[in-house]
Regions:
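N-terminal hydrophobic/helix-forming segments and targeting peptides
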Residues: 1-108, 141-145, 149
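Alpha-helical metal-binding/catalytic segments enriched in His/Glu/Asp
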Residues: 46, 100-102, 115-159
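A glycine- and small-aliphatic-rich helix-loop capping segment at beta-alpha/alpha-beta transitions
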Residues: 76-80, 117-126, 168-170
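Short acidic/His/Gly/Ser-rich catalytic and metal-binding motifs that mark active-site loops
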Residues: 109-117, 162-165
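A structural-propensity feature for long, helix-poor, extended segments
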Residues: 155-157, 162-170
Length: 170
């Protein structure tokens, strides 16, 4: 085989390793217990990953979410004792060009709020954050593969819980 073929093969193996590692990590995030992985912990990991990748990460919380009009995230989260966050990661490589944005749902636990789910249905509700985990790891793959586009990952992180301030139906 030629050196060019070997080089292509090696690139493919390296890409497969990167993709496999990122998929496994997204799966690991999804498998964490909901009482361990809240918006605070998820956003802290997001900041560390962005720093490793040389990407920009901005975390909006509490008053900043309210000030900027993110009422949907706040409404879903208002029954929770934990604070909602919005993590926005960016990697700009072509100044003045638009961004391709990936958005991943990050409801870290979804009890259904006042529209309470059955115990059986609630078992898998920690997986409502897998959209955010998958987008975060897709962002990592794109950055590490040095895509030539401006990319952004938007991760709304909330918990839909029952509480005296929880959003009511109707």
């Amino acid at each position: 085989s030629s050196a060019a073929e070997d080089s292509g093969f090696i690139r493919a193996v390296r890409y497969g390793e990167l993709e496999g590692r990122c998929i496994a990590y997204a799966r690991s995030l999804g498998n964490l217990p909901a009482n361990y992985l809240g918006a605070e912990e998820f956003s802290a990991y997001t900041e560390k990953l962005a720093a490793k990748l040389g990407a920009t990460c901005r975390i909006l919380d509490g008053m900043e979410l309210k000030r900027q009009g993110f009422g949907g995230i706040l409404a879903v989260n208002q029954g929770s004792a934990r604070e909602a966050k919005l993590a926005v990661l960016t990697r700009e490589c072509v100044p003045e060009q638009p961004f391709t944005a990936l958005v991943g749902k990050g409801v870290l636990f979804d009890s259904g709020g006042y529209h309470l789910k059955s115990a059986e249905a609630m078992e898998g509700m920690k997986f409502d954050m897998c959209g955010a985990a998958n987008v975060l790891e897709a962002f990592e793959i794109l950055v590490r593969e040095e895509t030539k586009e401006n990319i952004m990952a938007v991760l709304p992180l909330a918990e839909n819980a029952i509480g005296p301030k929880a959003c009511r139906m109707g």
